[in-house]
């Protein structure tokens, strides 16, 4: 491509293009498509102005070869192709002499006949898309836009094409020739695909008042004014290559930019080790609910009353016993804890009036489970600073874990529909302005797609548990309070339903700092036999506590009911975020909106209705080993929501690091996919940064395996 550009274009144009690229730190040898695009644009600007003059009478005339003495003035001032400082100087002087409004961005030409700036566009895509992008970018009625394409189409503001037919035909013919020349050398496809949308660089904000004074005060030494400094920055000529810049910074740094090819990326290395285990604060797909429909009992809405009434709906309780002990814990204590909960609930029932909250007796099993008196005693530093061998505890490296299949199943389940609705329509907030008519239409469509989703159940369950736990932590700091895990929903028929998942007992909670930990024991009902995937339940002690009759196609069957018990902990900041899990709805709604926006801008009308109602169309959801998975728009909504919810449920430093670092690699691979010929340095360092986050977290490991699927398909 580089050779082609040097043969095909006038050397002056090539030189200007090289200068322009170096000014932005780009290398014409690497970004060859961009090099070709800049040359083409320059040539079109020059052809646009060629042979057009204004005579003594101020009339516009075309002179191809004439009397050199005629008093002619060029009709167009060429701004494109000058260095930025000079270009702005020209623009400013035109504005001062003609009174035309100063543009925010550098235009390409000025037309002395029509007295307007002109923005020229040359596009490899459809002219109307590019026209819209230009118009959106410059947002000025005054600048005239004229777009040409390589297929001979053109589009201009108000269909006013400025030039005569013949001059425009010359430009179109030249563009068509360039296209054919490229195609004959096999360069056209890559060039056509490499076009990016408009980028906004040249914004000029007028700064006045206090801000202006602050700006003047904070200039680097030797600059008298902001204009002065701006002109210096605009005119600053970097040498164009990152290598040069880096070598100025440090003697030790040497960066060679390596081309990133389809053969370059390798898959991420996932850790070996025992399979990873469940670490969410509450059970997800394995949870079991005891429910009451149309609750109307006394004290309905008071958690303890609701819980007792849910417990009464079940008749299959039996003597509990341990069927999957916890590897490290004192398992009989977990058993005694459950027995204590049952006994204390029974005591409440026997009282005349049921209290609103229940504080558990501080038995030895509860003290053990909640880590009471386990924290090492804090000693004032003053008292021990003279101790000679004072040192911090050695902490063990976390043990590596391998990806287990259960986390993908958890995710699939989170995307499914349940038979209840978990949010009302107004869960996402109300309209304020008329513009929001479209917004509320989108919101209603979106809510309809996700209101029955299991991920939405997890949101409401998370909000409830975190709110209750934070409340109790502040209101009953010293008490071992019993907190029921409750959610509310509506059945298909619109009947209200209250669900009990189990109980939490919180430990002492004198939470001064955001990160101070409150311990709690969770006890959750389930029908999942832990012996099927013992590695998933490593952190739990599981009891069998009853038998449940289930209606199936073949009649009633009895299934053992289990109780998953574990010690866990959380902090004020984690509970605060847990209480705000509804934000996941908003995040995924915004992702869907940007998809609708993209469609709408192509079709030039709002596509919300078509988007949600065209049931036949499928959309990309994600990548699996089989390739790109597609599904209905509802499935896309639910998948995006589930991702957002899992990011919240499985939030961790490993996830933060993985998301930030893998995104860099993702962008490089996408650039490769778009034939933008990306280059990298220290790719090994990037891989290291990503892989140091792959330790033992199930959600991070799953994301890494998805990333590998994406890599495989992206570089094919």
UniProtKB/Swiss-Prot annotation:
Short sequence motif Nuclear localization signal 1 (NLS1): positions: 124-139
Signal peptide residues on this chain, from the entry's feature table: none
Cofactor(s) needed for function: Mn(2+)
PTM characteristics: Phosphorylated on serines and threonines by host kinases, including human casein kinase II.
Short motif (Nuclear localization signal 2 (NLS2)): ranges: 184-247
InterPro entries: INFV_PA (IPR037534), PA/PA-X (IPR001009), PA/PA-X_sf (IPR038372)
MF-aspect GO terms: endonuclease activity; metal ion binding; RNA binding
Enzyme class, spelled out: hydrolase
Cofactor note: Binds 2 manganese ions per subunit.
Pfam families xrefs: Flu_PA
Keyword Glycosyltransferase attached: no
Entry annotated with the keyword ATP-binding: no
Residues binding Mn(2+) 1: 41, 108, 119-120
GO process terms (BP): cap snatching; DNA-templated transcription; symbiont-mediated suppression of host gene expression; symbiont-mediated suppression of host mRNA transcription via inhibition of RNA polymerase II activity; viral RNA genome replication; viral translational frameshifting
Keywords, in A-Z order: Cap snatching, Endonuclease, Eukaryotic host gene expression shutoff by virus, Eukaryotic host transcription shutoff by virus, Host cytoplasm, Host gene expression shutoff by virus, Host nucleus, Host-virus interaction, Hydrolase, Inhibition of host RNA polymerase II by virus, Manganese, Metal-binding, Nuclease, Phosphoprotein
Subcellular location: Host cytoplasm; Host nucleus
EC number per UniProt: 3.1.-.-
GO cellular component terms given for this protein: host cell cytoplasm; host cell nucleus
Chain sites annotated for binding Mn(2+) 2: 80, 108
Gene3D superfamilies associated with the record: Influenza RNA-dependent RNA polymerase subunit PA, endonuclease domain (3.40.91.90)
Family assignment from sequence similarity: Belongs to the influenza viruses PA family.
UniProt function note: Plays an essential role in viral RNA transcription and replication by forming the heterotrimeric polymerase complex together with PB1 and PB2 subunits. The complex transcribes viral mRNAs by using a unique mechanism called cap-snatching. It consists in the hijacking and cleavage of host capped pre-mRNAs. These short capped RNAs are then used as primers for viral mRNAs. The PB2 subunit is responsible for the binding of the 5' cap of cellular pre-mRNAs which are subsequently cleaved after 10-13 nucleotides by the PA subunit that carries the endonuclease activity.
Assembly notes: Influenza RNA polymerase is composed of three subunits: PB1, PB2 and PA. Interacts (via C-terminus) with PB1 (via N-terminus).
Protein name (Swiss-Prot/TrEMBL): Polymerase acidic protein
Organism: Influenza A virus (strain A/Ruddy Turnstone/New Jersey/47/1985 H4N6)
């Amino acid at each position: 491509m580089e050779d082609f550009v040097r043969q095909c274009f006038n050397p002056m144009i090539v030189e200007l293009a090289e200068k322009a690229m170096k000014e932005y730190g780009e290398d014409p040898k690497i970004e060859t498509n961009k090099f070709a695009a800049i040359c083409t644009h320059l040539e079109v600007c020059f052809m646009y102005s060629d042979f057009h003059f204004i005579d003594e009478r101020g009339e516009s005339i075309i002179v191809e070869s004439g009397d050199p003495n005629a008093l002619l003035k060029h009709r167009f001032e060429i701004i494109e192709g000058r260095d930025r400082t000079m270009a702005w100087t020209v623009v400013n002087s035109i504005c001062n002499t003609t009174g035309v409004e100063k543009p925010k961005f550098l235009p390409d030409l000025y037309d002395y006949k029509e007295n307007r700036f002109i923005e020229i566009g040359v596009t490899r895509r459809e002219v109307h898309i590019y026209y819209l992008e230009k118009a959106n970018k410059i947002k000025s009625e005054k600048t005239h836009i004229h777009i040409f394409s390589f297929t001979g189409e053109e589009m201009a503001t108000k269909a006013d094409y400025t030039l005569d037919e013949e001059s425009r035909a010359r430009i179109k013919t030249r563009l068509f020739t360039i296209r054919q020349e490229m195609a004959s050398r096999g360069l056209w496809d890559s060039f056509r695909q490499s076009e990016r949308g408009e980028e906004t660089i040249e914004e000029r904000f007028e700064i006045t008042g206090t801000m202006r004074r602050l700006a003047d005060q904070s200039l680097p030494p030797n600059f008298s004014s902001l204009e002065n400094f701006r002109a210096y920055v605009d005119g600053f000529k970097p040498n164009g290559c990152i290598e040069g810049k880096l070598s100025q910074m440090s003697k030790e740094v040497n960066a060679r930019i390596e081309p990133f090819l389809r053969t370059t990326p390798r898959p991420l290395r996932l850790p070996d080790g025992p399979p990873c285990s469940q670490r969410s604060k509450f059970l997800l797909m394995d949870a079991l609910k005891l429910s009451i429909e149309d609750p109307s009992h006394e004290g309905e809405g008071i958690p303890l009353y609701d819980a007792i009434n849910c417990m009464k709906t079940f008749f299959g309780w039996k003597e509990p016993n341990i069927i999957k002990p916890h590897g490290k814990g004192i398992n009989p204590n977990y058993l005694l804890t459950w027995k204590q909960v049952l006994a204390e609930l029974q005591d409440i029932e026997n009282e005349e009036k049921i209290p609103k909250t229940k504080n558990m007796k501080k038995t030895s099993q509860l003290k053990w489970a909640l880590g009471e008196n386990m924290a090492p005693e804090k000693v004032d530093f003053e008292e021990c600073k003279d101790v000679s061998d004072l040192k911090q505890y050695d902490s063990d490296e976390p043990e590596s874990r391998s990806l287990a299949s259960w986390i993908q199943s958890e995710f699939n389940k989170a995307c499914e529909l349940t038979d209840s609705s978990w949010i009302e329509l107004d869960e996402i907030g109300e309209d304020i302005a008329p513009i929001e008519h479209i917004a509320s239409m989108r919101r209603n469509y979106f809510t309809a797609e996700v209101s029955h989703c299991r991920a939405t159940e997890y949101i409401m369950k998370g909000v409830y548990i975190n709110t209750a736990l934070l409340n109790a932590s502040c209101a009953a700091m010293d008490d071992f309070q019993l907190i029921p895990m409750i959610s509310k929903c509506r059945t298909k028929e619109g009947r209200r339903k209250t669900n009990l998942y189990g109980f939490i007992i919180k430990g002492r909670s004198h939470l001064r700092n955001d990160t101070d930990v409150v311990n709690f024991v969770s006890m959750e009902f389930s029908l999942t036999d832990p012996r099927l995937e013992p590695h998933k339940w490593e952190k739990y002690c599981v009891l069998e506590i009853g038998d449940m009759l289930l209606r199936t196609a073949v009649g009633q069957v009895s299934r053992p009911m289990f109780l998953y018990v574990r010690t866990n902990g959380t902090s004020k900041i984690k509970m605060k975020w847990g209480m705000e899990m509804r934000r996941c709805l908003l995040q995924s709604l915004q992702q869907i909106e940007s998809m609708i926006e993209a469609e709408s801008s192509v079709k030039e009308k709002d596509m919300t209705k078509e988007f949600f109602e065209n049931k036949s169309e499928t959309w990309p959801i994600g990548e699996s080993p089989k390739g790109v998975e597609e599904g209905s728009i509802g499935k896309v909504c639910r998948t995006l929501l589930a991702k957002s919810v899992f990011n919240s449920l499985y939030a961790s430093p490993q996830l933060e690091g993985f998301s930030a670092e893998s995104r860099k690699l993702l962008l490089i691979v996408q650039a490769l996919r778009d034939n933008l010929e990306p280059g990298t340095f220290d790719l090994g360092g990037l891989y290291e940064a990503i892989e140091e986050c792959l330790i033992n977290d199930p959600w991070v490991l799953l994301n890494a395996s998805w990333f590998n699927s994406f890599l495989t398909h992206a570089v094919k």
